[in-house]
Amino acid sequence: MSFDYFYGQQSDLFTFYRVPKVLFTNERFWNISADAKMLYGILLDRMSLSAKNGWIDKNGRVYIIFTIDEAKMALNCAEQKAIKLLSELEKKAGLIERKRQGLGTVSYTHLRAHETPE
């Protein structure tokens, strides 16, 4: 299989996940895997959709609903790996906070700002 080249304005036709550079350059985040950093970029993308849809909690914070199955699909990985990556973002890096809404329901996830003082 061969791929054709991009021509002219075609390069603007695709959407991309944006992964904050600070996750790779600041030693505070060196303890989390590249896959977890990629997942954070995917969660940031989902957050912008949630903001557009008005998914704001009572404290004015945007939240997302992103299940383990969605993480598995997004990264093409097994369930245990998806759980591990979300745990890295929450417990190791402090970049997300998951709140369970009740037994058998999905968790609300709040993303935390990734900026750190230099």
Model-derived features: positions:
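Extended hydrophobic/Leu-rich segments
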Residues: L13-F14, V106, H110
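Single conserved hydrophobic/aromatic residue that forms the stacking wall/gate
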Residues: H110-A113, P117-E118
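Short recognition helix of helix-turn-helix/winged-helix DNA-binding domains
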Residues: M1-D69
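Winged helix-turn-helix DNA-binding recognition segment
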Residues: R46-Y108
